[in-house]
Amino acid sequence: MELQRNFFIFAFLFVSFLLWQAWQSQSLKKNKKNEETNSFFHLNHKKEDKNQIIIKNDVLRLVINMYGGDIEEASLLDYKTQLNSPENLKLLETKSDFVYQAQSGLIGKDGLDNSINKIRPLYSAKKNFFELGHNEKELRVPITFIAKNGITYIKNFILKPGKYNVEVEYDINNLSNKKLELNIFGQLKQTVKLPKNRDIYSGNFALQTFRGAAYSSSDAKYEKYKFDNIANHEHLHIITHHGWIAMLQQYFVVAWVPDTNISSSNIIYTSYLDNDGIAIIGYKSSLINIPSNSRYIIKSKLWIGPEKQQEMALVAPNLDLTVDYGFLWFLSQPLFKLLSTIHNFIGNWGFSIILITFMMKAITYPLTKAQYTSMSKMRELQPKINELKKNFGHDKQRMSKEIMALYKKEKINPLGGCLPVFIQMPIFLSLYYMLIGSVELRHAPFLFWIKDLSDQDPYYVLPIFMGLTMFFIQRTSSNNISDPFQQKIMHFMPFIFTVFFLWFPSGLVLYYIVSNLVTIIQQKYILSNFKKNQKR
């Protein structure tokens, strides 16, 4: 009876989780505040190879359009598009069917990026290729625009070795006889509909994570905002004194972090280009005054790279929260730290998962012992319970009262076997989110045919073996179920779970296999000891 209840509870929770995932992907977050879009959101770009420069360090390769100095392409040199692919992953890209750019500029009365006729300034550079040297600590790439009034605008891109954060610095030399009034902005724009070559998990519900916009403000450490909301013109207009804006996808993030020292406040906004199907999230600073005959420097940071929590936390507060661990982030984060610590010693993520499974089973062993002890006691009481059902079957209320009195007399908690299920489910889900949300596990091999623990088993060997272990567990305990129909349902449950697990990350299936094997050993040990104690 206990095992039957446990399986049904676990199945109910599991299916509820899958339905919740599907609902999340379809539901819309209602409008926070609708705002009229400003024209600078829609700044045009001219993609001409002769007006592009390339800058790179050892982890990033950036293509910059000299019209406005926007970053139109960003390749991550340590990450490939897919497993065994020679092509580096392009996080930012500008193509005919897909646009993903990081734009920045100066707007307002004296801004270069004219919001009236949408013309971008054409910067100049000394050459078209810049690369960080082997022993250099910093690569500073200046692009320059000299206005007719004698004002010099220098836009510096600063890269450091091994770093994914790009410092974007405006150096403005106001040699005119008037005060300048302008605002700095930074925005991300991306085509909402992915082309097939970028939508690699479209057919696998189990491996999909959040893709959309996000921000941090004075009132919210971290908020996700769906592309669907932006496409429906449910636009954000948030005044904040600090924070950042970002666009997220599985394992990777692009984020603008404004310098709060040069602006008393910033406006976080969203917009949507209906004709192009492009979503925009950005920030605009408050008014910046630059006196005549003075020099002024405005800085901002741009993160273009993997969701590495420790590094992102150093770039901006709360930026590390963009790692999508779902609603159980408070469990996934410590589990990942523990898993990383184990990996530092073992060097293999698969064996690290196995070891953390042993640790979880050891921690929950008292609950497992209580579960199977309760099951055994319930089985011993089954003849007495059947007798009560026979005697009081005509009076359901009296029968329930007598059965509860029997439980109390024998010191049995009828719900004692359910607690391990409720403990196991959050651990299972937090591991699931950790495996599909941690970039460290992307393309991480285990053994033999398992080349990527974050992806499904290509040959379905692990899910089938997991189903066999589950079948063995429930079969060895099915003596508690007397109803033949219920027995058939319980025998069918492993098959249902096997089908679900076909598309789950192989690392998660590995965890469940090891957990089941340990459960089988614990089950035999606990039941054997119980029988010995009963004979004494």
From Swiss-Prot:
GO terms for molecular function: membrane insertase activity. It is found in: Cell membrane. One of its GO terms (cellular component) is plasma membrane. The keyword Transmembrane helix applies. The chain crosses the membrane at residues 7-27, 338-358, 419-439, 453-473, 494-514. InterPro entries: Membr_insert_YidC (IPR019998), Membr_insert_YidC_N (IPR028053), YidC/ALB3/OXA1/COX18 (IPR001708), YidC/Oxa/ALB_C (IPR028055), YidC_ALB_C (IPR047196), YidC_periplasmic_sf (IPR038221). CDD domains: 5TM_YidC_Alb3, EcYidC-like_peri. Belongs to the OXA1/ALB3/YidC family. Type 1 subfamily. Interacts with the Sec translocase complex via SecD. Specifically interacts with transmembrane segments of nascent integral membrane proteins during membrane integration. NCBIfam families: PRK01318.1-1, PRK01318.1-3, yidC_nterm, yidC_oxa1_cterm. This is Membrane protein insertase YidC. The gene is yidC.
